[in-house]
Structure formats: C-alpha cells, structure tokens
Amino acid sequence: MSQPLTVDCPTCGAPVEWDAKNAFRPFCSDRCKLIDLGAWAAEEHKIAGSQESEDELYSGDLEPRH
C-alpha cells in the first residue's frame, strides 16, 4: 500500500492527510477553514487581475444610469 498524500494546512501549516474522510481538506480543522474564509471575506486574499479588464468585460451588460 502506498503512503497517503500529505499537504500543509494553508492556514497553520500543520500536516494534513489528503483523504476523502477528511471533511476539512486541505485544512486541518474547521477552525482553520473558517479563518481562511474570514480572510477572503475581509479581502485579505485576492485573485490577481486588473480592474480595467473586469470593467471592459461587464460594461456592455449594464444600461447607463440617468
């Protein structure tokens, strides 16, 4: 039998076994999962991209305000 895949928890760095039985993967616990969610909600994490490209992408979908 092969060794189980182990990854580091993105929040605290603890080793986490990557297994379907682990409901929190890639996190080690519900607490670390919620800390990460809070960081996204507080905009501490962002996906790289320019604001201009987003504006161009959606500007035709909206009717002008009067």
Swiss-Prot record:
Sequence positions that bind Zn(2+): 9, 12, 28, 32
Superkingdom of this protein's organism: Bacteria
A GO term for molecular function: zinc ion binding
GO biological process: one example: regulation of DNA-templated transcription
Disulfide bonds listed in the record: none
This protein's encoding gene: yacG
Note accompanying the cofactor annotation: Binds 1 zinc ion.
Family to which this protein belongs: Belongs to the DNA gyrase inhibitor YacG family.
Region annotated Disordered, chain positions: 45-66
Listed InterPro entries: DNA_gyrase_inhibitor_YacG, Znf_NHR/GATA
General function of this protein: Inhibits all the catalytic activities of DNA gyrase by preventing its interaction with DNA. Acts by binding directly to the C-terminal domain of GyrB, which probably disrupts DNA binding by the gyrase.
Self-association state and partner proteins as the record states: Interacts with GyrB.
Keywords: Metal-binding, Zinc
Cofactor needs: Zn(2+)
Protein name: DNA gyrase inhibitor YacG
Classification via SUPFAM superfamilies: Glucocorticoid receptor-like (DNA-binding domain) (SSF57716)
